[in-house]
Amino acid sequence: MRPLDAVELAEPEEVEVLEPEEDFEQFLLPVIHEMREDIASLTRERGRAPVRNRGKLWEMDNMLIQIKTQVEASEESALNHLQGAGGAEPRGPRAEKADEKAQEMAKMAEMLVQLVRRIEKSESS
């Protein structure tokens, strides 16, 4: 490799030099305004996130309450059906199976409620 000759170097392009005030108004002010808008947007978004999370937790809590209510209603319905069908008769395998299913559903609903409460607790701290 040979060294470059001074003549071979490209001459720098002439750049229009602006007055400091023009430079500030033309280039820096728009950037500053854009940055302020970005900061304001991020601040608003940061403020909305906890509200959105609380809304989701509220929805989950309502859903769990509905599930628990449905489980209790179906359990009560199954018990009423069994009592109406054969009041004094001994319970059969279907009745025992229905009781087991109702207990499993109640346990699942309770676990879901506990999960939501843990999530709420971790979100609040």
Swiss-Prot record:
| Keyword Nucleus found | yes
> InterPro entries, alphabetically?
MRFAP1
Naming one, the record's GO cellular component terms include: perinuclear region of cytoplasm
Q: Which domain of life is it from?
A: Eukaryota
- Region feature (Disordered): 76-99
Q: Keywords on this record?
A: Coiled coil, Cytoplasm, Nucleus
Location(s), subcellular: Nucleus; Cytoplasm, Perinuclear region
Q: List the disulfide bonds.
A: none
Q: Which residues form a coiled coil?
A: 94-124
Q: What is its main location?
A: nucleus
UniProt subunit comment: Found in a complex composed of MORF4L1, MRFAP1 and RB1. Interacts via its N-terminus with MORF4L1. Interacts with CSTB and MORF4L2.
Family per record: Belongs to the MORF4 family-associated protein family.
What is this protein's name? MORF4 family-associated protein 1
**What organism is recorded for this protein?**
Rattus norvegicus (Rat)
